[in-house]
Amino acid sequence: MATRAFGTCFFEQYAQISLSALLGSEFDCLVNKDRPDLQSPDGKSIGIEVTRAMEESKQAEMALLKDVAGITKGESDHDIDQILEYGYGFGLQGGKYIGLKEFSYWSMALPMRRILESKVSKVGNGFYGHFTKMGLFVFSRENLGATEAVKAMKYTISLQQYLDIRYNRLYIADVDDLFVCNLDDGLKDDSRLIQYRITQEQRQAFYQEAVQRQSIQL
C-alpha cells in the first residue's frame, strides 16, 4: 500500500468507517490506497476517490481560521480535548473547529462545482483506473440540505453523461448527514438520492475509530 499523508488519511479512514456503518458490510474490506483512495482488496470491484469541498465565501474563510489555537486542554468539554489531542475536528462540535493536523487539508479545498468538474475529468481519462463500481466521496465544510445535494448529483450526471468511465455513486458527507446519490443511467431523479442522518453518538464513534487507526499506522 502506498504511503499516505497523515492528515489526508484520517478523512479517507473516516469515509470508509461511515460507509461501512451506514451502508453495510460491502464497504468493510476497503483498504486505503492511492488513485483512488479506497479500494476493494482485489483492486477491481470497488474504487472510491475521497476529496473535500468548501465554498469561497467570507463565512467559509472565517470558519477556516477558527481553529483551536489558544484553547488549553482541560478548559472546555471532552470534544475540545479530543481536537487538541488528536489534531482533527471534523465530526465534533458541529464542525465549528478545524484541528491543526487537518488545517492544510481544508485550506486547499475547492468549491463543490469545481471539485466535481476536476474529479469527473480525472475519472473519465482513466486516472483512477477501472473498477466495477466507482464512487466519489466528498466531505463538505458546509451543512447541506437535500436540495443542494440533488444539485450536486445532477451536475455530476451532466458532466459525465458522455464518458465511458464514470462514477456510479456520489457520496456527500457533512457533519450531520451522508447523502448517497445513485448516478447510474435509467433512474428517475426522485429515486436517486438517500439521506442518512448521522447522530452525535455515531459521529463520536466514527471520529474515535479514525484517530485510533492513525495511532496504529504511526
For every predicted segment, state its role:
Residues 19-40:
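A short acidic/basic microdomain associated with nuclease active sites
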Residues 1-26, 51-190, 195, 199-206, ...:
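Metal-dependent nuclease catalytic core centered on acidic motifs
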Residues 38, 46-52:
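Conserved catalytic cores of phosphodiester-cleaving nucleases, focusing on short active-site segments
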